[in-house]
């Protein structure tokens, strides 16, 4: 699918529309096999932007570093940092994904109340160009509200959320990433879920690739159940941690109540303390894989930096079709307008 076609999809409209990804579940594959099957293509890369968060050994955010404290490596080659901003004020586009599967029924009211407070704080304290889109997911994915700065509209949609069967977590990430990709500024996904995926056509690797193509940072908020289940499957938590680390975000595992509010507050603080690093790639060796490995270093051993681990750019060889943009079947989506 072309970028223009994706921009006109149901997931980019102002009305709520239910979208279903049309690939069979047999698409799921192991990580090694997935890496071998990534199509080769060439994409013009100009300025590559990297958002970085730095913490000290106590886990506290560090927001006063200088440009000279950072080093950026593209496929192992050090790059000149052309743009540097502390506490960047680039506009935010936040996709808030809320799990409304049956397993979240007991926690859903607490989650939506806390998410409402999060959105109020985010939109009242930040850039007036900041915008949030709201998605819910159970057996399919619903765009409850397209990108807006209107908190009241988002609050109304949040309070109307109801549960259903199934958890199409990876499909939700994939579709939200597609909607985030054309937007300017910083792009973030905040995912409120209890963990596991049960209904997606996409797998974790396709979801991560879509987020990386969109330059989106993923913050999973994995809500611990009110009644602890010793036998609960934690595979979904590991997958979400994998995606967070691959995009420069970090996972949160709160219980409902004050811990959930604190997790949302920490996300806002982190977003307001990010460094923006940007470079024009040069001398980075081209590879068969379009994925360029990124590494951001800070020249102080007591500090730890979080940033996305790569981006999709030029590859050795000819031109091809960007595979991540051709895998949506428009005829296979379920579309439903909300009254």
Roles of regions detected by a PLM:
Residues 5, 12-15, 331-336:
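Short, low-complexity interaction segments enriched in Ser/Thr/Pro/Gly
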Residues 34-339:
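Scaffold/interface architecture of coatomer-like assemblies
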